[in-house]
C-alpha cells in the first residue's frame, strides 16, 4: 500500500507540473491573440481603403475585360492578355492552385485537422485527377501532410511569425503571382480557418487569383478623381500585385488569429483537465492513505487483543 501511495504522489506532482506548463502556454497564447486581434482590426481599415482605391483605378480595365468576355468567347489565347490586366484576366481553368494555411506545430486543438480535412474533401469533390490541381502550403503541418500523401506540392513556406509582417508575405505573393503568370495554375484559392471568436473558427476557401472581388458599382457614385503619374497602366502594374499581397496578408492574419484562439482554448482545456485529474488523484490518495491507516490500527488492536 505504501508503494501505491508513492505512485499516486508521483502522478500528482507530474500532473501539477504539466498543468503549470499548459497554464503558462495559455497565458502566452492569450497575449498573442489579444495583440493580433488589435492589429487585425487596424489592418481591416487599411485593406478596405486599398480595395476602394484599386477598384476605382481598375474600373476601366474591369469594364473592358467584361466587354471583351461578352464579345469573344474564346479567351484561351494568353497572348491577348495585356500585362496590366494579367491579375484580372479570367481564362479557361485547366489547373487550380490551393494555398493552404496551417500552423508549424501542434498544440492548437482541431485547428489544423479542420483545414486539412475540409481541403481533402474539396479536392475529392472538385477534381477527378491529381493533374487538375497543385498545392502551396504555408505552415509545416500542411506541408508535411501533403508530402505524406503524395500530393503535388509546388511551394511551401515555414516559420511565419506569430504576428505576421508584410515582408514575410511578399515572398509568398511574388511566388504565387509568378506561378499564375507562368500558367502553373489558372486560378488560386487561399484556404484557411477564419477566426469567428475565441471558441469558434470556420473553414474558408477564397479565390485570390485572378482578382475577382472588385465591384465597379461600389465606386460608380464616387466623385473622387486621382492624379496619376506617369500613367494608369504603370500604376496598375504596381498596385495590383500590392492588392493581391494585401488579400493574402489579410488571410494569413485571419488564420493566425484563429490559430492563437485555438491554442488558447486547447491549453485552457488541458489546464482544466490537469486540475480535474489532480483532484481525482488527491481523493484517491486520501482514500488509500486512510485505508492504510485503518489497516495499521486494526493490526495494532488485533495484536493488543492477542496479548491479553
From Swiss-Prot:
Subcellular location: Cell membrane
Pfam families listed in its UniProt record: ATP-synt
Topology with respect to the bilayer: Peripheral membrane protein
Keyword Ion transport annotated: yes
Membrane recorded as keyword: yes
Protein name: ATP synthase gamma chain
Superkingdom as given in the UniProt entry: Bacteria
Family per record: Belongs to the ATPase gamma chain family.
Described function: Produces ATP from ADP in the presence of a proton gradient across the membrane. The gamma chain is believed to be important in regulating ATPase activity and the flow of protons through the CF(0) complex.
Amino acid at each position: 500500500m505504501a508503494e501505491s501511495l508513492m505512485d499516486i504522489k508521483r502522478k500528482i506532482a507530474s500532473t501539477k507540473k504539466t498543468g503549470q506548463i499548459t497554464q503558462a502556454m495559455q497565458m502566452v497564447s492569450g497575449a498573442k491573440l489579444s495583440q493580433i486581434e488589435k492589429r487585425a482590426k487596424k489592418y481591416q481599415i487599411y485593406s478596405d481603403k486599398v480595395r476602394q482605391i484599386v477598384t476605382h483605378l481598375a474600373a476601366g480595365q474591369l469594364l473592358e475585360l467584361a466587354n471583351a468576355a461578352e464579345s469573344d468567347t474564346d479567351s484561351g489565347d494568353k497572348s491577348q492578355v495585356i500585362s496590366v490586366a494579367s491579375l484580372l484576366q479570367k481564362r479557361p481553368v485547366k489547373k487550380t492552385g490551393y494555398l493552404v494555411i496551417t500552423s508549424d506545430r501542434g498544440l492548437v486543438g482541431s485547428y489544423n485537422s479542420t483545414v486539412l480535412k475540409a481541403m481533402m474533401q474539396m479536392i475529392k469533390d472538385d477534381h477527378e485527377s491529381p493533374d487538375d490541381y497543385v498545392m502551396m502550403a504555408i505552415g509545416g503541418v500542411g506541408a508535411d501532410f501533403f508530402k505524406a500523401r503524395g500530393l503535388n506540392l509546388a511551394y511551401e513556406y515555414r516559420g511565419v511569425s506569430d504576428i505576421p509582417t508584410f515582408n514575410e508575405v511578399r515572398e509568398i505573393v511574388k511566388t504565387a503571382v509568378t506561378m499564375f503568370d507562368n500558367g502553373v495554375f489558372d486560378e488560386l484559392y487561399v484556404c484557411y480557418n477564419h477566426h469567428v471568436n475565441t471558441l469558434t473558427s470556420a473553414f474558408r476557401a477564397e479565390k485570390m487569383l485572378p482578382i475577382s472581388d472588385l465591384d465597379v458599382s461600389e465606386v460608380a457614385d464616387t466623385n473622387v478623381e486621382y492624379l496619376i503619374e506617369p500613367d494608369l497602366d504603370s500604376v496598375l502594374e504596381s498596385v495590383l500585385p500590392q492588392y493581391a499581397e494585401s488579400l493574402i496578408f489579410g488571410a494569413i492574419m485571419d488564420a493566425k488569429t484563429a490559430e492563437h484562439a485555438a491554442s488558447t482554448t486547447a491549453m485552457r482545456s488541458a489546464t482544466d483537465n490537469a486540475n480535474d485529474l489532480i483532484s481525482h488523484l488527491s481523493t484517491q490518495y486520501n482514500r488509500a492513505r486512510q485505508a492504510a491507516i485503518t489497516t495499521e490500527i486494526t493490526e495494532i488492536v488485533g495484536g493488543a487483543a492477542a496479548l491479553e
